[in-house]
UniProtKB/Swiss-Prot annotation:
Taxonomic lineage of the native organism: Bacteria, Pseudomonadati, Pseudomonadota, Gammaproteobacteria, Chromatiales
Protein name per its UniProtKB record: Methylthioribose-1-phosphate isomerase
Family, similarity comment: Belongs to the eIF-2B alpha/beta/delta subunits family. MtnA subfamily.
Keywords in alphabetical order: Amino-acid biosynthesis, Isomerase, Methionine biosynthesis
Function, in words: Catalyzes the interconversion of methylthioribose-1-phosphate (MTR-1-P) into methylthioribulose-1-phosphate (MTRu-1-P).
Length: 348
């Protein structure tokens, strides 16, 4: 670990002390910093669905600890642990359908449940801790790899929130940004608002301010003008699911940024751990896209902003075709100009 890793990494969204799970309620940022106690698996699933916690890696970590909480409520002499825990696994799996890390983490926990041995809750806790700790280590590795791709530039543009709030710590795309800023490869960050939940305004800007990294907020509609100005060298984003050919599902608006970046000659980077890559999904057409309540678009901060009687369409994610992506950065390495053959080679 380098000193810059600590200098620009102070935020944690998921806390586990061996007995209890606490989640930073991201719905209340930046006005309030409140950690919620998560007493059981039902509360963990609700926290994921209601976006107390969000970001694919953080969702997976939360789900893993949720399985631990579920196992601890069962008698030590439970005859069939998998049968007893299956409803809890299914409840967690149904909480957010697009984030593949959720299903990856649950599969790892299910594998432990299927192993013969004593004290299953303790073994599940050890596995959940490994998932959490490995995510942090992988993020720091991706930070180094992604920053190494960058020539010195005035700034980068990022979308949604991909930092410590969305992961086990440090971040995916924001991990690259943290590393690049620590190496003085960039001077500042532009973050777009990311409607309708305003993750860029509420979360990314807040997180970067906490860590002393200069950040300017923009409306999504300003992205094209920003790119045309020449101030941005890269667009750096995360991912909720990457298909076998490199097509990438991420927060709604990512696809538009990729189109704009290609038009303006700005390079486009996706940063995600290999747990986000779904080799069983051939391309982006097979990625399920969550649609959220229309009230999120028709209102803002709990107040109506649209004309009464207006409808809305509210997909939470979109799919960026692989041909618009210059690099996918993972903890295993970098795939430039991704396609199916390159993704297959990475995952071997």
């Amino acid at each position: 670990m380098k000193p810059t890793d600590l200098a620009f990494d102070t935020v944690r969204a998921v806390l586990w002390d061996g007995t209890s799970l606490k989640l930073l309620d991201q719905r209340r940022l930046p006005r309030e910093t409140v950690y919620l106690d998560i007493p059981d698996v039902g509360a963990a699933a609700d926290a994921i669905r209601e976006m107390v916690v969000r970001g694919a890696p953080a969702i997976g970590i939360t789900a893993a600890y949720g399985v631990v909480l579920a196992a601890r409520r069962l008698p030590a002499d439970t005859p069939d642990w998998l049968d007893a825990l299956t409803p809890d696994l299914e409840r967690l799996a149904a909480s957010r359908p697009t984030a593949v890390n959720l299903f990856w983490a649950l599969a790892r926990m299910k594998s432990v449940i299927g192993q013969v041995g004593a004290d299953l809750p303790a073994r599940l806790e050890a596995e959940a801790r490994r998932i959490h700790e490995d995510d942090l280590a992988d993020n720091r590795r991706m930070g180094e790899l992604g920053a190494a791709l960058m020539d010195p530039a005035e700034a980068v543009l990022t979308h949604c929130n991909t930092g410590s709030l969305a992961t086990g710590g440090y971040g995916t795309a924001l991990g690259v940004i943290r590393s690049a800023y620590g190496q003085q490869r960039i001077k500042k960050v532009y973050a777009d608002e990311t409607r309708p939940w305003l993750q860029g305004a509420r979360l990314t800007a807040w997180e970067l301010v906490q860590d002393g990294i200069p950040v300017d907020l923009i409306c999504e509609g300003a992205a094209a003008s920003l790119m045309r100005s020449g101030r941005v060298g890269w667009v750096v984003v995360g991912a909720d699911r990457i298909a076998a050919n490199g097509d990438t599902a991420n927060k709604i608006g990512t696809y538009a940024l990729a189109v704009l970046a290609r038009h303006h000659g700005v390079r486009f980077m996706v940063v995600a751990p290999t747990s986000t890559i779904d080799m069983d999904t051939p391309d982006g057409a097979g990625i399920p896209i969550e649609e959220r309540p229309v009230s999120e678009v028709l209102g803002l901060a709990g107040q109506p902003v649209a004309a009464e009687g207006a409808g809305a369409w509210n997909p939470a994610f979109d799919v960026t075709p692989a041909e618009l992506i210059d690099a996918i950065v993972t903890e295993k390495g970098v795939v430039e100009r991704p396609d199916r053959a390159k993704m297959t080679a990475l995952m071997k």
